[in-house]
Amino acid sequence: MARGIFITATGTDIGKTYVTALIIKRLRETNINCGYYKAALSGAERRDGKLIAGDANYVYNIANIKGDPNDAVSYIFQQAVSPHLAAKLNNVEISMERIKKDFYSIKNKYDYITVEGSGGIVCPISTGKKKIMLDNIIKIFKLPAIVVADAGLGTINSTILTLQYMKEKNISVKMILLNNYNHEDIIHIENKGYLSDNLLIPVYTCNKNANNLEIPVEKLIEIYEEI
């Protein structure tokens, strides 16, 4: 049976894709067959008449995943707006059935699957005939989660608010990862210490522009759960 994890963040442009790529890369370097999936992506580039799923393309390149990155994303939009608005602008009805079909297709190819969210945890995927929130996708696939947060000023507030929302939605958070971490920045050091001391969730860091995660592979494997 495959194992999975969901990567979310405290907001947009925090570094979900970057962290996701490094996690998958770390596992694949130890011969773990780990794949990638994303339900909806906006802000795609158009090349030669085709939309390119930039996040997926980045992950595939960094983690050395073979195949077409676009196949790992159910809905790809050019406009750099939230998925529900992009769907409106393109007259597209986002379907949970298609998301499920694509997810299970990816799941059948890999032993481990890493699912990346869109924006922060409170993200409308569809406001059409059937309302879909990001947390609906997490719960349907019974995925635990990693929360990516920026290491800098304000992260205590945004991280705890994110965790509170996820607790209300009964989503299991396995790890907090502080991105852009600087070991010499007193704010970063204090933020990590505060979160570590006040939460019952492991807190790890990712240095800015790091090529690898300084997290033991065993710890990463532990947080993936059977799905």
From Swiss-Prot:
SUPFAM superfamilies: P-loop containing nucleoside triphosphate hydrolases
Magnesium listed as a keyword: yes
Organism encoding this protein: Clostridium botulinum (strain Okra / Type B1)
Subunit structure: Homodimer.
Protein name per UniProt: ATP-dependent dethiobiotin synthetase BioD
Recorded family membership: Belongs to the dethiobiotin synthetase family.
One BP annotation, GO: biotin biosynthetic process
Chief location of this protein within or outside the cell: cytoplasm
Keywords per UniProt: ATP-binding, Biotin biosynthesis, Cytoplasm, Ligase, Magnesium, Metal-binding, Nucleotide-binding
Catalytic activity annotation: (7R,8S)-7,8-diammoniononanoate + CO2 + ATP = (4R,5S)-dethiobiotin + ADP + phosphate + 3 H(+)
Lineage: Bacteria, Bacillati, Bacillota, Clostridia, Eubacteriales
Positions annotated to bind ATP: D13, I14, G15, K16, T17, Y18, D55, E116, G117, S118, G119, N179, N180
NCBIfam families membership: bioD
Positions that bind Mg(2+): T17, D55, E116
Pathway: Cofactor biosynthesis; biotin biosynthesis; biotin from 7,8-diaminononanoate: step 1/2
Binding site for substrate: S42
The keyword Ligase appears for this protein: yes
EC number, as in UniProt: 6.3.3.3
